[in-house]
Structures are given as C-alpha cells and as structure tokens.
Amino acid sequence: MGEDAAQAEKFQHPGSDMRQEKPSSPSPMPSSTPSPSLNLGNTEEAIRDNSQVNAVTVLTLLDKLVNMLDAVQENQHKMEQRQISLEGSVKGIQNDLTKLSKYQASTSNTVSKLLEKSRKVSAHTRAVKERMDRQCAQVKRLENNHAQLLRRNHFKVLIFQEENEIPASVFVKQPVSGAVEGKEELPDENKSLEETLHTVDLSSDDDLPHDEEALEDSAEEKVEESRAEKIKRSSLKKVDSLKKAFSRQNIEKKMNKLGTKIVSVERREKIKKSLTSNHQKISSGKSSPFKVSPLTFGRKKVREGESHAENETKSEDLPSSEQMPNDQEEESFAEGHSEASLASALVEGEIAEEAAEKATSRGSNSGMDSNIDLTIVEDEEEESVALEQAQKVRYEGSYALTSEEAERSDGDPVQPAVLQVHQTS
C-alpha cells in the first residue's frame, strides 16, 4: 500500500510539470496555426493525462476503503471483547438469580414453618387463655367462699371413718336374731353421728362472743365419747363374731361334714353289715389265744372303693374275737406308738383285708379249719413270733375301734366325744 501511494504521487508531480510547461510553449507564436502533427500529439497527451488521473483517484479510493475496513475490523474486535465481557456478566447475573431463587425457596419453607408454629402457638395461647379464664372463675369462687368463711369466722370439720369389721357370715350363717341386733345397732350409730353433728356450732362471733369456748369443749368431749363408744362396739362385735365362729357347735358341724365327705352313708352301712356277720363267724371259730391274721400273702385284687371299708371290718373282727383281760395294757401300748407305727399298721390292715375277702368267699367251715391249721404251735420260737403278731393285730383293732367310734359320732352331731377322738388319733 505504501508503494502504491508513492507511485501515485510520482504520477501527480510530472503531470503538474507538463501543465506548467504547456502554457509557456504557445506564447511565442500566438498567431501561427497548429499543424496536424501537433494536434495528434496533444490528443495523445490528453488521453494519457486522463488515464493517470483515473488511476490516482482509484488508488485514493482504495486507500480510503482499506482504512475504513481496518477501522471496521478494529471496531469488530472491540465489539467482540465487549460481547465476551457482557456474556460473563450475564452468566454471573444468572448464577446470582439461581442463588436468589434457592434462597427464596428456603425462606419460603422457613416462613411456612414459622406460620405453622405461629398457628400452633396461637391455638395453645387460646387454650391457655381458656384455662386461665376457668382458673380465674374458680379462684373467684374460692375467694367468695373464703370471704364467707371469714365472715362467719367459726367453723369445724369432722372427719370420720368407720373401721372395717369381720363379717360373721364368713364363718357361720348367723340366725335372724343377729341381723335384728345389727339393725338395732345401726340406728344407734346414726344417732351418735347426728348428735355429734348437732353439737357443731356454725354461728358467727357476733352472735355468741362469750360462749364459744364452752361450746367447743363440749363438742370435743362428745366427739371423743362417741368415738370411744364406737371403738368399744366394734371390738365387741369382733369378739362375738370370733366366738360364734369358733364355738363348739360350729366345730362339731364342720367335723361331721368332713366325716360325711370322707366316708359316705352307703359305705357305713356296708361296714356295719360286714362287722355283724364277720364277728359272729370269727367268735364261733375261736380256737386258741394266739391268733394270727389268716392268709397274709393273698394275691386277690380288690376294688379301690371297698378296700378302705373292708380294711376297717377286718381289723375290727380280729380283736373282737380276742378280747383279753388286759385291756389297759393294750391301750397304753396303742398310745405309746408313733406315727410311723400307724403307717405300718395300716399296710398290714390292707393285707389282712384281702385275706378276709378270701376267707369270707370260702365257707365258714373251711375258714375255721384254715385258722386252726395256722394257729398250731410246735416250737417256742413260733410262740414268740405269734405273740408279737397278736400284739400288732390288737393295736390294729384298737385303731379301727377309734375310727369306727369317730364315724358313729359323725352320725350324731350332739355328742361331744368327737373332739376327744380326733385328739387321741
């Protein structure tokens, strides 16, 4: 571009020189006419001058365009830089807006929570206000009552709690007379309560300024007297109920009930029948003073219901046939045994019961023969063994007699011997 500008300047300078030279040339000959050769040269020079002028103008225009394009490019670069800076600022603004939106969401959540809490607090405050209003009303009522009491300035509070008594119906059913007595005693208690309540004076100090102390003393004395009377009555009732519960008649009734539960009426009748029949048979078949229980090793099975009854029958038959003159010695021997000997005697009685069933099933003659055969004594050692067994059998008989007497006494509740029998057993 710089070279083009220099060439354009060169072309401009010779043209100006030629123009300066042209007017100087025709000045010497103004009156002469130009020749045709001169005219041709002038036209060519004019064409050349015009072409040079056009080239210079084009070059100048091109230079201007180049300068304008350079300026435009520079402006575009500046605009691009500005656009980049604007984009960065816009991105920052967008980030700030997103942050603001997040903060706005969090603030909206917190505000909603605060609103809920405020609603709850308002509800609680309303409830508290209602409670406070109620309490205020109650306090006002209490204040009014207190003011009334202060105006009266003379009041008493009586606290009474009746003691829990032992009901006699737990032990024994009381007759109608006991209920009548209780009805008669209740109005007395009510009367005493009414008397104590009437003694309380609720008058004011203005009405009775001088007689207050005397009235208080009399009321306290009456209250103490009524309490002492009630305590005495309750203690007497308890003692009476205990006496009635543990009276002789009640104990006998209970013992009779236990006897009926243990041994039924049917079993008693069976025992009596078996006692009468077996007693006659064994008394007729008595052979020697040394009696041994017959057939002690029996294997016959017996029903459970009749085992106890037959045990008593057998133990009753054997000593009845062998009543010895030394009854006092037998009683002392029976009382000297312990509870362990009682258990062994019961076991032997069961064995004897089984043997008795076998003996009764057989004929009376065969029973007598077997008893005679078993009671034959050959040596002195056998005699000593027989004596020991006879003593055991006698003890069993005494125990069976006591049990039979107890059962008979159960049938007759009036007899007082029931307690003595149980004590000895």
From Swiss-Prot:
Function: Plays an important role in caveolar biogenesis and morphology. Regulates caveolae morphology by inducing membrane curvature within caveolae. Plays a role in caveola formation in a tissue-specific manner. Required for the formation of caveolae in the lung and fat endothelia but not in the heart endothelia. Negatively regulates the size or stability of CAVIN complexes in the lung endothelial cells. May play a role in targeting PRKCA to caveolae.
Entry-annotated residues carrying N-acetylglycine: 2
Modified residues (Phosphoserine): 27, 35, 37, 51, 203-204, 218, 283-284, 287-288, 293, 332, 341, 366, 370, 403
Induction info: Up-regulated in asyncronously growing fibroblasts following serum deprivation but not following contact inhibition. Down-regulated during synchronous cell cycle re-entry.
Phosphotyrosine: residues bearing it: 395
Protein name as catalogued: Caveolae-associated protein 2
Biased composition (Polar residues): 274-287
Family as reported in the entry's similarity comment: Belongs to the CAVIN family.
Chain intervals for the UniProt region annotation (Leucine-zipper): 62-100
Subcellular localization: Cytoplasm, Cytosol; Membrane, Caveola
Tissue: Highly expressed in heart and lung, and expressed at lower levels in brain, kidney, liver, pancreas, placenta, and skeletal muscle.
Coiled-coil region(s): 61-82, 125-154, 210-268
Post-translational modification, as annotated: Phosphorylated on Ser residues.
Record lineage: Eukaryota, Metazoa, Chordata, Craniata, Vertebrata
Superkingdom of origin organism: Eukaryota
